C-alpha cells in the first residue's frame, strides 16, 4: 500500500526477487479456486477463443474466482472485468464459494448495462457457471455465455493477469492484522485499480476514466 500511495510501480517478478533476497514472506496465500466438478450442467462453447480485442465497452466480459487463505480461514473474490478498459464492472467478496456469490456479482454487473448492450461473459467450466440458475439469469439479462476449454487457463488470460497484479501489488507489499483488515485493504485496492491505477495501453488513464470516455463517445 505504501508503494502504491507513493505512486511507485514495480513488476511483480521484481517484488518476488527482492522479497526472496530479504527473506520476506507473503502472509496471505492466494490461489485459483478449483471450481470444476465435472459436467454438472451445460457447457457453453468457447466463443471468446482468446480474442481479447474490443471496439467498445460491454462487448466482452470475463470472470473467475480466486481464493485467499489467511488466519486459518478462506476468502473468495469473484469479479467481472470488461475487456475494453480492463474495468472492474462488479465483484463480490465472500466467505464461501457459493452460488449466490456469482449470482450477486452478475446482478451488480447487469445493472450497469446500457439499453441494448449484450456482452459475452467468459469463464472457466466451474460448477457455478454450469448451474441452470446462473445460465438462466445470463439469458434474462441478454448476456451470451462463453467458457474456456477444460484446464486451459490461457483461454481466460486477462483475468489470470488481473489476479497476478492483485497478488503482486497488494499481497506482497502488505501485512494484515485480521480477516477484516484484509477485506478492507482488498476493497481499497479494487477501488484504486479502477479509479486511480493508470495503464499505458489506456493512454495513461485508469480503467474507470477510459471506460467513461468510451461510453460518452459512443
Describe the residue ranges of each PLM region:
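Mobile genetic element proteins and their domesticated derivatives, centered on retroelements
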Residues: 15, 19, 48, 64, ...
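RNase H-like polynucleotidyl transferase catalytic core
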Residues: 28-34, 121-125, 139-158, 174-178
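An active-site-proximal beta-strand-loop segment
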Residues: 54-89, 95-96
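Active-site beta-loop-alpha junctions of metal-dependent nucleic acid enzymes
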Residues: 73, 92-115
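Basic, flexible linker segments flanking DNA-binding modules
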Residues: 1-56, 152, 208-215
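C-terminal domain-tail junction helix/linker
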Residues: 132, 139-143, 165-218
Amino acid at each position: 500500500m505504501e508503494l502504491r500511495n507513493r505512486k511507485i510501480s514495480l513488476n511483480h517478478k521484481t517484488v518476488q526477487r527482492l522479497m526472496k533476497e530479504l527473506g520476506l514472506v507473503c502472509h496471505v496465500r492466494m490461489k485459483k479456486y478449483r471450481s470444476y466438478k465435472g459436467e454438472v450442467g451445460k457447457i457453453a462453447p468457447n466463443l471468446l477463443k482468446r480474442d481479447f480485442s474490443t471496439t467498445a465497452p460491454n462487448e466482452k466480459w470475463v470472470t473467475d474466482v480466486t481464493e485467499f487463505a489467511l488466519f486459518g480461514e478462506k476468502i473468495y473474490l469473484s469479479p467481472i472485468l470488461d475487456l475494453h478498459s480492463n474495468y472492474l464492472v462488479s465483484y463480490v467478496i465472500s466467505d464461501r464459494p457459493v452460488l449466490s456469490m456469482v449470482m450477486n456479482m452478475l446482478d451488480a454487473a447487469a445493472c450497469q448495462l446500457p439499453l441494448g448492450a449484450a456482452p459475452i461473459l467468459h469463464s472457466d467450466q466451474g460448477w457455478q457457471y454450469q448451474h441452470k440458475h446462473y445460465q438462466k439469469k445470463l439469458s434474462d439479462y441478454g448476456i451470451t455465455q462463453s467458457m474456456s476449454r477444460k484446464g486451459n487457463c490461457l483461454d481466460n488470460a486477462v483475468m489470470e493477469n488481473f489476479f497476478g497484479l492483485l497478488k503482486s501489488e497488494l499481497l506482497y507489499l502488505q501485512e494484515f492484522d485480521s480477516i477484516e483488515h484484509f477485506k478492507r485493504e482488498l476493497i481499497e485496492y479494487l477501488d484504486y485499480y479502477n479509479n486511480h491505477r493508470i495503464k499505458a495501453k489506456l493512454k495513461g488513464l485508469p480503467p474507470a476514466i477510459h471506460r467513461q470516455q468510451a461510453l460518452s463517445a459512443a
